[in-house]
């Protein structure tokens, strides 16, 4: 498994694609709109850039990417109208960044359609709040490296990306077949997951500090956990069920045990406390906002109740969403022929889990500003 090659969402627009199975990301985008608006307005008001540079890190492909672009355009248009600045002649430059395996071809086709319709849409939504000119470019590369010149970006955004690590921890599983943190995992292995997060997030902050202009901000949204106890995270259940599904294929002789023994997910879902500790240690950013909110595993279940009314359907929905995210990674390790059977088994196990416990994702949204050091 090579992270830069294999870590990307399922491509295309078929039934198992990320484009068709990214409703959780869409719902989360709606939840964080007030945070994004506050940060965007603050940067624009403080800096009044002639060209405002905005970067979406880990953009993937599909409509959610352009929802973010559209949202920022709308925020600037409304702000200019409210404060009589329609003639500021501000331009927006968007950079959409992801690893090279991302479906940039699909994304560029969507951008072409978006460019044709954006002026009409914003004119109808905001009367005289005409959108500023915008320019959109793709930018392949890892956000765990430098990807922009020094002090060139005004606003960074990232949605559902910073739970991904730059590499998976390496270790001998010996007696267990876990792929993510569980209570049966050795303390030394758990520590490797935590250390990789600390290393990656610290590096990410230092890199972005160099690339942000003075007064620039970041809005970062990623899967975390509600509690400090590393064994009680919601992700533990989600990926534990995937590990069980893979083990069932080992028992059937469809997956080699050695391949599962050597497979760890390059992920870590931190607590707010862990995030704040690294921010304090790095010391390069001021925190404007931090919040944890929850959303149901099943992206089509919008009910607040503690009961899943159709566990079979919810299991299938959860499996489709996870497959859209995990398919390339799983296929690189175990081969494509097992995918249908694996995620069918996973849907069954998720349904059984949801019969007993309605589980939610814990999502952290963080707004931070580049600190000024005199």
Curated annotation (Swiss-Prot):
Pfam families attached to this UniProt entry: Methyltransf_7
| SUPFAM superfamilies xrefs | S-adenosyl-L-methionine-dependent methyltransferases
Quote the function comment for this protein.
Answer: Methyltransferase involved in the biosynthesis of methyl anthranilate in response to stresses. Utilizes anthranilic acid as substrate. Produces exclusively the O-methyl ester.
| Family, per entry | Belongs to the methyltransferase superfamily. Type-7 methyltransferase family. SABATH subfamily.
Q: Which residues bind anthranilate?
A: 25, 164
Name of protein: Anthranilate O-methyltransferase 2
Would the keyword Nucleus turn up in this protein's UniProt record? no
**Species:** Zea mays
Record field: catalytic activity: anthranilate + S-adenosyl-L-methionine = O-methyl anthranilate + S-adenosyl-L-homocysteine
InterPro entries given for it? MeTrfase_7 (IPR005299), MeTrfase_capping (IPR042086), SAM-dependent_MTases_sf (IPR029063)
Residue sites binding S-adenosyl-L-homocysteine per the record? 18, 59, 64, 98-99, 142-143
**Cysteine-cysteine disulfides:** none
Which EC class, in a word? transferase
For this UniProt entry, the molecular function terms from Gene Ontology, in alphabetical order, are: S-adenosylmethionine-dependent methyltransferase activity
Induction is noted as: Slightly up-regulated by herbivory and jasmonic acid, but not by salicylic acid.
Keyword Transcription regulation attached: no
Keyword list (alphabetical) reads: Magnesium, Metal-binding, Methyltransferase, Plant defense, S-adenosyl-L-methionine, Transferase
Q: Gene encoding this polypeptide?
A: AAMT2
Question: Could you tell me the EC number(s) of this protein?
Answer: 2.1.1.277
Listed under GO biological process in this entry are: defense response; methylation
Q: Where does Mg(2+) bind?
A: 261, 263
């Amino acid at each position: 498994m090579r992270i830069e090659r294999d870590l990307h969402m399922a491509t295309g627009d078929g039934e198992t694609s990320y484009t068709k199975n990214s409703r959780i990301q869409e719902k989360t985008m709606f939840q964080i709109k007030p945070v994004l608006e506050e940060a965007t307005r603050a940067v624009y008001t403080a800096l009044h850039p002639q060209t405002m540079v905005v970067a979406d890190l880990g953009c993937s492909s599909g409509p959610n990417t352009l929802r973010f672009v559209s949202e920022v355009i709308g925020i600037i248009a409304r702000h200019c109208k409210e404060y009589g600045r329609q003639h500021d002649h501000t331009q927006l430059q968007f950079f959409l960044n992801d690893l090279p395996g991302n479906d940039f071809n699909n994304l560029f086709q969507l951008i072409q359609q978006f460019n044709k319709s954006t002026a009409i849409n914003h004119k109808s939504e905001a009367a005289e709040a005409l959108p500023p000119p915008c320019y959109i470019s793709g930018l392949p590369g890892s956000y765990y490296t430098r990807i922009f010149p020094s002090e060139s970006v005004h606003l960074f955004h990232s949605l559902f990306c910073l739970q991904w690590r730059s590499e998976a921890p390496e270790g001998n599983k010996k007696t267990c077949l876990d792929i993510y943190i569980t209570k049966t995992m050795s303390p030394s292995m758990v520590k490797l997951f935590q250390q990789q997060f600390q290393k990656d997030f610290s590096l990410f902050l230092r890199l972005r500090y160099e690339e942000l202009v003075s007064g620039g901000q970041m809005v970062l949204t990623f899967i975390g956990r509600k509690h400090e106890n590393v064994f009680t995270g919601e992700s533990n259940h989600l990926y534990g069920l995937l590990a069980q599904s893979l083990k069932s294929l080992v028992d059937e002789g469809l997956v080699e045990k050695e391949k599962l023994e050597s497979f760890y997910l390059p992920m870590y879902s931190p607590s707010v406390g862990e995030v704040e500790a690294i921010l304090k240690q790095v010391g390069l950013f001021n925190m404007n906002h931090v919040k944890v909110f929850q959303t149901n595993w099943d992206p089509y279940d919008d009910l607040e109740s503690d009961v899943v009314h159709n566990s079979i359907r919810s299991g299938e929905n959860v499996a489709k969403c996870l497959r859209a995210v995990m398919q390339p990674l799983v296929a690189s390790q175990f081969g494509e022929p097992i995918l249908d059977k694996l995620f069918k088994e996973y849907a069954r196990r998720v349904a059984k889990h949801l019969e007993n416990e309605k589980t939610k994702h814990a999502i952290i949204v963080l707004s931070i500003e580049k600190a000024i050091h005199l």
